[in-house]
Design a protein with these regions (language model features):
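Short, structured coil segments at secondary-structure junctions
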Residues: 128, 149-151, 290
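A conserved acidic beta->alpha catalytic loop
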Residues: 136-144
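Acceptor/aglycone-binding surface of glycosyltransferases and processive sugar-polymer synthases
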Residues: 158-160, 164-173, 180, 192-273, ...
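Hydrophobic helical membrane-anchoring modules
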Residues: 1-97, 272-336
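Short beta-strand-to-loop acidic/aromatic patch adjacent to the donor-nucleotide binding site
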Residues: 177-189
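Conserved short acidic donor-positioning loop in nucleotide-sugar-dependent glycosyltransferases
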Residues: 123, 137-138, 160
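Donor nucleotide-sugar binding loop of glycosyltransferases
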Residues: 112-115, 139, 162
Length: 336
């Protein structure tokens, strides 16, 4: 079932259908049929095909106007009636002041024995961090021991998968005493120094999502290739189109994010841990559909310590993850 955009007012969620998003898809479908009909016409003339091919060809071109027209009407209706309300809601400046800015940090880890120790130490030594949790997703090396020695509380998530590891991070963080929760990876690609930036944004949002879009903040030798960079940006804009008026989104693949406890508690029943490498896009889409305010914050991005095992292993794997993200945004996430 397709999720719908929403706004949250006084604790209630007012659901607004994503007419612009649906209309845009119908316009693209109509134009696709039209251009297919034109190409078919060229081949029909070259091959000198007569009836019934001519009738099929003309029907394809003429009927392509129906989804295009309906799509234009839906998009126009959204822009005229719904967009102002969604944009007005998203521009409310202060959600709620944060009195205690200390955070609980939850790190995902899988066979990260080389990086998890330095990563935990980096977060433990930050003055705003009150607790570091590491969720070990059945590592076969010394990840558990190294994380524990560095000062983290370590738990093992036996069910494999990035989504299940992240979901367990959320559950463990909610068991701690703290109103602000950081989700991150234990591979040293992200640093604790960016916590200050994330916390600075949280008074304006329920969720602050890190973005690696700023070139000057990325190390030259990261696993984020040019293909991954622009593919990630494209999916971010698709998310923005789906939730038009709710914000600007440029990075759907970043694990690093700061979440208010009450927001995460609202989202937990809606999240599906079976969603794997595309879980971050699933999280953002679900948060926006639930009426949470989501803001992006530029963060630094560094080379990975150890061997990458996620969606950044290669461009081919990144393409597969990206396509699953697109399918989730268009047709809904498994179990949603």
């Amino acid at each position: 079932m397709r999720e719908v955009a929403s706004t949250r007012t006084d604790g209630r969620v007012k659901r607004l259908p994503p007419l612009f998003f649906t209309g845009s898809l119908m316009i693209m479908a109509g134009l696709g049929l039209y251009f297919f009909g034109i190409i078919f016409s060229i081949f029909r003339l070259i091959l000198q095909l007569q009836e019934p091919f001519r009738a099929w060809n003309m029907a394809l071109i003429w009927y392509s106007g129906f989804p295009t027209t309906i799509g234009v009407c839906l998009a126009g209706l959204d822009l005229a009636l719904l967009f102002p309300a969604k944009r007005r809601e998203s521009r409310r400046k202060i959600l709620a002041p944060v009195t205690d800015k200390h955070v609980v940090v939850a790190l995902t880890a899988y066979n990260d024995e080389k990086s998890i120790g330095p990563s935990v130490a980096d977060f433990v030594n930050h003055p705003l961090v009150k607790r570091v949790i590491v969720v070990d997703n059945n590592s076969r090396d010394r990840t558990f021991d190294n994380a524990q020695e560095a000062g983290a509380r370590v738990v093992v998530e036996k069910d494999p998968g990035y989504g299940r590891c992240v979901y367990r991070c959320f559950k463990e963080a909610l068991n701690e005493d703290g109103d602000l929760i950081i989700l991150c990876e234990g591979d040293m690609t992200f640093r604790a120094a960016d916590i200050d930036k994330l916390v600075a944004y949280i008074e304006h949002a329920d969720v602050v999502n890190g973005t690696r879009i700023v070139e000057q903040l990325r190390d030259y030798a990261t696993q984020l290739s040019t293909f991954m960079y622009y593919g990630n940006f494209f999916v971010g804009k698709l998310l923005e189109l789906k939730h038009l008026g709710r914000g600007t989104f440029t990075d759907v693949g970043t694990t690093y994010k700061l979440i208010r406890r009450d927001s995460l508690m609202r989202l937990m029943p809606r999240l599906n841990p079976a969603v794997n490498m595309e879980f971050n896009a699933h999280f953002m889409d679900t948060a926006l559909a639930n009426g949470e305010r989501l803001i992006e914050c530029p963060i630094t991005f560094h080379p990975r310590v150890g061997v990458s095992k996620g969606g950044n292993v290669s461009n081919v794997r990144a393409l597969k993850v990206g396509l699953r993200m697109i399918m989730g945004l268009l047709f809904g996430w498994p179990g949603a």
